[in-house]
Amino acid sequence: MDRSEIVARENPVITQRVTNLLRTNAPLLFMPIDIHEVRYGAYMLFMYGSLENGYKAEVRIENIPVFFDVQIESDNTNQLFLKSLLTAENITYERLESITQRPVMGYREKEKEFAPYIRIFFKSLYERRKAITYLNNMGYNTAADDTTCYYRMVSRELKLPLTSWIQLQNYSYEPRGLVHRFSVTPDDLVSYQDDGLTDHSIVMAYDIETYSPVKGTVPDPNQANDVVFMICMHIFWIHSTEPLASTCITMVPCKKSSEWTTIVCSSEKNLLLSFAEQFSRWVPDICTGFNDSRYDWPFIVEKSMQHGILEEIFNKMSLFWNQKLDTILKCYYVKEKRVKISAEKSIISSFLHTPGCLPMDVRNMCMQIYPKAEKTSLKAFLENCGLDSKVDLPYHLMWKYYETRDSEKMADVAYYCIIDAQRCQDLLVRHNVIPDRREVGILSYTSLYDCIYYAGGHKVCNMLIAYAIHDEYGRIACSTIARGKREHGKYPGAFVIDPIKGLEQDKPTTGLDFASLYPSLIMAYNFSPEKFVASRDEANNLMAKGESLHYVSFHFNNRLVEGWFVRHNNVPDKMGLYPKVLIDLLNKRTILKQELKKLGEKKECIHESHPGFKELQFRHAMVDAKQKALKIFMNTFYGEAGNNLSPFFLLPLAGGVTSSGQYNLKLVYNFVINKGYGIKYGDTDSLYITCPDSLYTEVTEAYLNSQKTIKHYEQLCHEKVLLSMKAMSTLCAEVNEYLRQDNGTSYLRMAYEEVLFPVCFTGKKKYYGIAHVNTPNFNTKELFIRGIDIIKQGQTKLTKTIGMRIMEESMKLRRPEDHRPPLIEIVKTVLKDAVVNMKQWNFEDFIQTDAWRPDKDNKAVQIFMSRMHARREQLKKHGAAASQFAEPEPGERFSYVIVEKQVQFDIQGHRTDTSRKGDKMEYVSEAKAKNLPIDILFYINNYVLGLCARFINENEEFQPPDNVSNKDEYAQRRAKSYLQKFVQSIHPKDKSVIKQGIVHRQCYKYVHQEIKKKIGIFADLYKEFFNNTTNPIESFIQSTQFMIQYSDEEQKVNHSVKKMVEQHATASNRAGNPAGNPAGNPAGNALMRAIFTQLITEEKKIVQALYSKGDEIHDLLTYIINNINYKIATFQTKQMLTFELSSTHVELLLKLNKTWLILTGIHVAKKHLQALLDSYNNEPPSKTFIQQAIKEECSSIKPSCYDFIS
């Protein structure tokens, strides 16, 4: 069935009504989804979406004025002058028009409020852009000068949101296939608000399955033998998870299902063409998949290119027909679109943007919703939402079914693929993704594409311009081009009161916070660029005329920045653009939150089976989406105001907001202190306050006069919390009145949400406690935690568990009469249990995550990825599977564990493995498959101890001298060192490792002495060899033979070393084999290997010296050995050639050949020796072994060598 047939089947009543309206050319409702512009020639705007019943529609808007504005700042600049400038540059324009507007930058008094501008009209965007560039380069200020997407300006000027219902009037109508085409002018479009309307836009969710003959690899579209063999597709109403139609396109026949239509294709080319054909029958408004912008779309496009059908496929799918291949690749195949996930993270997307259908990657949407998610797979996101999971079908089985062509099994593959596509829509609906982004688009006058693919600041900027240009906000002329010098520096820091660290168990602490501090400051002090006064003379002049000004000053890049903002004094007409917009957003959100609360209460009273439940649920989701959109804009407002790349950026405003925040927090601080309250901590927009002791006198005395049981103490704590709540409510009202008197408005307010008791502060922005919100609640399992490392992304379960145990134990109510263990005692008790009783930990407790960012200098991750790359290359050489070592996508998080490596020491006895985390990292799947031992001690030392030190670093013994600047860092370092010594004292493995190092150093000292003796003998012999000019060859032979005999004399050294190692092994066995260590004595083997390697290295240096000392000897050896090689070669081919040699030469040749054999044998022996050592053989090679090795090697390299010599 095609789209029109499906719509008629599903919505017969609405379809009949829409059909009647089309016949009579009556007004129609249209929901835009996708926007495209014709930028060359006469400008036209195309909007694609659906009519009220779900019909696909194209709305072409013609006769849109194309213009921008130029500010006239000189009497010499007029229309004639501008015309001459444009004509001189061959810029074609239509006409010029004089207008007046308010400039956005700088305060202007009432009589000079408006400035003259000239509006220049054009026929095309090309000429307009040329003119903007030219006049900006000439120094003119321009406005309404969008140079990227003109449709945003159209939306702002017409007050026509691009993501909500629009009523089409006076249209020209032309049905064409499945698409209903309309032509209108801007006057024929009217914004239509009706939240009760149901949107019947269509979403297509799809998934592809691919195959590679190279097992264990991810199929690559650039490989000819890697194919896409199946594509499964559903279509849905945009708000529903029930499929309207489903199709499975496959290259392999599979058992048919009643739940979907199966199309069997004979080749990959036909499969791709069938996909495009089905797409064209459904003409969806939105196309979505999971990770399709990173895999599915690039695979489809690349394979279509290889088959030479991309142009055909695009023109089937697109509503812009007859596009050529180069145009498709240049304009519609988006290869690298950077999508903002969070402030720190972006992701690259690739997709084919066919006009009429908006591409949307569900994975990107979910990552934006869960920016700190450890796992970003489809299965993980489904689990987070409590939705049904995907089907479990391993790739190796899927590929096996594909190879065997088993239709029964291929039906399982089809079901797997169909369900994956279904789950994409499930996630979109569960998270209300499209309605949320639509509401953002409505507020910001941007398209749905903008709301998906652009960051929040871009939309805030567009929203500000939309407010500014209309009469009710003063017709402010705004540019979209950032101007002026862009300075980078820090604005005034927040006012911070260092925390009083430690555990507070005697009286409650309450957090007092400014509500939306920065937006509140903007509203209170009228921070807005058109209210800014730059000069002191102008400020004095305005104050003399009775204006009230707010002065700001701060240091920025070693200079004083100052300025004044004209205050509004609560007079609406005096409010600046920023405060007006924020107040409007705030009022709208307040109304929506009230409505949301009522709808929520109704939802709780109605069962899901009630006929009206779905409608109520839909209404609740829509209202929630609206208030969320408002919240997003309010929260990102200051970010755009402080962004030095924004056209609205004003340094005195950005710094003035933060410095005013400082001022007000100090103001409240002094007020609270003077009231007799105490301050535990303060930072940026909040203070943590304790009430005066006198508040609790009566309840404390009642407790002291009681039997002092634990029940009485709990009652005391309960009453203290209630008294604190009451006192803070009163204090909060007093603070707000004090602020109102100071700044003259009620926009700047403080509120308290919870009382913390007990509470512990461990550092700046680091604290935890039991939160009491409406009533006292002493549940230690529901702690209020801020900044403690257990909530940090990537942490292991081990760290979280130990941290939670410490915090829960410290939060227990204990009477003063009982033993109240200090925090350091609690930490040591929990830590000891964690270290000594290691059997309590499971493999999952050690899994942690990290992000792969190739451009970031994360040494451990870089080392790990380098190792994984080497493994992949090694496996590929042998034709083995390597997918288990695949590199994650840049920016993607991956899971790993730290495994135990054999403790290694260098030749001097120093450990070499402590600083190489990257060498110990292993993927979780690999560590599980090979049952690799976890390096628990690494986790304890590198993760757990830092967390534990944070709890105790306030102890007196860890405090720094007065001359230390960073006292917290010093105390933290000392506390961690203290805990490291504590762990060494209780961990058996750590003791064993220390002993190993001592034995290594003893052995090294002994062996080093012996080596020096032997090297001395070698040196004398080779010295004689080089000085013996009469018979150098004989001396060389004797010296080299001595090297072979040296191996016999090594036994003395080895015997002594072996004895030390055996003693160490005995001592280690008595200490017990530590958990996670393999049995035996690998440390001893490593020691032997290290010593042997040292001996070999020293010998090799001497042998290599033969080739570098003495040109004569070198040349002689080379000449004769070459002749030997030549003779052997000729002998092997039985083609002996005449070669005249004197008897002296023959004798010399034979002696040198013997020498060469011995020399070769030494290298061979070393090779065999190294192989032997690598297998942990404790016994050194004997003389017999070396001689046998020489014979074997020589006979293998030169089979006829001995025959020739004889």
Swiss-Prot record:
SMART domains: POLBc (SM00486). Coiled coil: none annotated. It catalyses: DNA(n) + a 2'-deoxyribonucleoside 5'-triphosphate = DNA(n+1) + diphosphate. Keywords: DNA replication, DNA-binding, DNA-directed DNA polymerase, Nucleotidyltransferase, Repeat, Transferase, Viral DNA replication. Its EC number is 2.7.7.7. The keyword Oxidoreductase does not apply. Sequence repeats lie at residues 1071-1074, 1075-1078, 1079-1082, 1083-1086. Residues 1071-1086 are annotated as: 4 X 4 AA tandem repeats of A-G-[NK]-[PA]. It is an enzyme of class 2 (transferase). Pfam families: DNA_pol_B, DNA_pol_B_exo1. GO terms for biological process: DNA replication; viral DNA genome replication. InterPro entries: DNA-dir_DNA_pol_B, DNA-dir_DNA_pol_B_CS, DNA-dir_DNA_pol_B_exonuc, DNA-dir_DNA_pol_B_multi_dom, DNA/RNA_pol_sf, DNA_pol_B_thumb, DNA_pol_palm_dom_sf, DNA_pol_type-B. The keyword Repeat applies. PANTHER family: DNA POLYMERASE CATALYTIC SUBUNIT (PTHR10322), DNA POLYMERASE DELTA CATALYTIC SUBUNIT (PTHR10322:SF23). Belongs to the DNA polymerase type-B family. DNA-directed DNA polymerase involved in viral DNA replication. This is DNA polymerase beta. The lineage of its organism: Viruses, Varidnaviria, Bamfordvirae, Nucleocytoviricota, Pokkesviricetes.
